[in-house]
């Protein structure tokens, strides 16, 4: 890489000298070979030591540069708040599978106990399991989640109270909304994963 850069720098110096000497020749100079090493890095598959490919410009960067506070991708995608939140949360596929298993085990309206009236009929009014799983993965806070799924304020406050009951170990409140003893473990497991990543902040 250093040799290629140095050769490129010499070539650029010669080209600029030629431009100064022959101003009309500026348009005829092809610098694509000078920039070729940059383009190949962006168009090839990423190396294991730089496995993240920026979606906008195709630049490969190290995982350590994701969500570090300094944009490395041209469009700043490596610092996108949704990406950084999703990096801390369980994968969307895992969340969707977990939601599906809750629905399969406890019935199509089970998640209404957590998310409110719009969660009836296997979450169809909220856009389905996949959309809810994505919103849980990308939403930094419960407020962001409510906005992403257009939850009513009452449903959002209900969800917040369920989270607080889980966090505080208030089994009485959870039972009062119809969560049975046999279901408590599943609900607690699911909600604690979100709480640990700042969902209630």
Swiss-Prot record:
Ranges of residues in domain LDL-receptor class A: 45-85
Disulfide pairings: 46-60, 54-73, 67-84
Tissue expr: Expressed in central brain, antennal and optical lobes, in gnathal, thoracic and abdominal ganglia and in the retrocerebral complex (at protein level).
InterPro entries: IDLSRF-like_peptide (IPR053103), LDL_receptor-like_sf (IPR036055), LDLR_class-A_CS (IPR023415), LDrepeatLR_classA_rpt (IPR002172)
Database matches in CDD domains: LDLa (cd00112)
Main location: secreted
Entry keyword annotation includes Disulfide bond: yes
Residues of the signal peptide: 1-28
GO cellular component: extracellular region
GO biological process, one term: neuropeptide signaling pathway
Protein name in the entry: IDLSRF-like peptide
């Amino acid at each position: 890489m250093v040799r290629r850069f140095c050769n490129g720098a010499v070539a650029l110096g010669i080209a600029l000298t030629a431009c100064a000497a022959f101003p009309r020749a500026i348009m005829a100079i092809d610098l694509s070979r000078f920039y070729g090493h940059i383009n190949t890095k962006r168009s090839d598959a990423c190396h294991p030591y730089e496995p993240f490919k920026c979606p906008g410009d195709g630049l490969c960067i190290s995982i350590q540069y994701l969500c570090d506070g300094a944009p490395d991708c041209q469009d700043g995608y490596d610092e996108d708040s949704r990406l950084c939140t999703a990096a801390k949360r369980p994968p969307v596929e895992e969340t969707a599978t977990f939601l599906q298993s809750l629905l399969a085990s406890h019935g199509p309206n089970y998640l209404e106990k957590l998310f409110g009236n719009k969660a009836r009929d296997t979450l169809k009014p909220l856009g389905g399991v996949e959309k809810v799983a994505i919103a849980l993965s990308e939403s930094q806070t419960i407020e962001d989640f409510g906005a992403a799924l257009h939850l009513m304020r009452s449903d959002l406050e209900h969800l917040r109270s369920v989270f607080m009951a889980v966090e505080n170990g208030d089994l009485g409140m959870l039972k009062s909304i119809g969560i049975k003893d046999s279901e408590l473990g599943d609900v607690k497991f699911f909600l604690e994963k979100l709480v640990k990543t700042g969902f209630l902040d």
